[in-house]
Amino acid sequence: MAKAVEVLQKEIGYSNVEALGETLQNIVNDNTAQQVEGLPSQKAAEELNKAYQQLDLTSYSSEEIRRMIQFTFLKAAKEDGLQMNHQMTPDAIGLLVAYMIDQMTKKDESLQIADFAAGSGNLLSTILLFLQ
């Protein structure tokens, strides 16, 4: 994933976080680099597609994928100098919220949880994985 982020940064001039977002979008879109107005170049798109094919996410658990994205985002945020309020919710906070939800709800009760400021989605994914 880091290779794809690097290619997008150099080719399009994206920040680390923007390149990570584009990379994740490309992975979701059948591991295919999207070209808009000729960017990235055909050569770079082929390089990106090769990197996406090498990243076999089916061999990882949901938690491993979440952590891979989290660590890549933390690296990108550090390199970009992101403001504190734009950074990912730490796992410790997610686990604390999940524990509180677990303690305050009935085990057989169906829950609906909404995070209207979802951002990266790390808080919700941490809660979901904890409550499963």
Enumerate the predicted regions with their spans.
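Conserved S-adenosyl-L-methionine
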Residues: 93-132
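A short N-terminal interaction module
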Residues: 1-81
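Conserved SAM-binding loop and adjacent beta-strand
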Residues: 82-98
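Functionally constrained cores in energy, signaling, and assembly domains
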Residues: 11, 15, 30-31, 87, ...
